Amino acid sequence: MAVRIEEVPVDDARAVALRGMLDDELTVRYGPVTTDEDPELTAARRAALRVHPDDVIATFLALDDDGTPLGHVMLRRLGADLELKRLIVPAAARRRGVGRALTTAVIERARAEGACRVVLQTGKPQPESIALYTAAGFTPIPVYEPYIASMPRSLCFELALAP
């Protein structure tokens, strides 16, 4: 099966649907927000995870031969850095190189934008993501803003890009 990467608008219906699938999967992996949690912490976490469309540089879909979406990723501006966000490859499409192809698309776009590095945030309940990012050359870094206060146990990574 060939995987084709296509850049789409951030509000592309297929991209929105895949981000919804990601939200559902992350709720299963991390658990739902409980009523016991401090509402200010919940609000801070939601704000940290929110991606404003104006900050998105590129949204990519991975498609199979017949155009069926296999995965999604975004690249956003975050201060002086570019951040890989919202990578999702549904379970049925995993182990086919889709995540690798999407990660490569983000890295290539970041280079074209003149970025010095790409950063990302993930967590222990996402071991497949950690393996993918490590295989792509990302290395661990300290938790960075906007995740420090609301998600201090995040696992963060960077990929330094050669000038």
Predicted stretch roles:
Residues 10-11, 21, 116-119, 123-163:
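C-terminal "cap" of GNAT-fold acetyltransferases
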Residues 6-85, 90-91, 103-105, 109, ...:
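Acetyl-CoA-dependent GNAT
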Residues 2-4:
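Extreme N-terminal starter segment of soluble prokaryotic enzymes
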Residues 97:
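Conserved G/P- and acidic residue-centered "switch" motifs that form tight phosphate/ATP-binding loops
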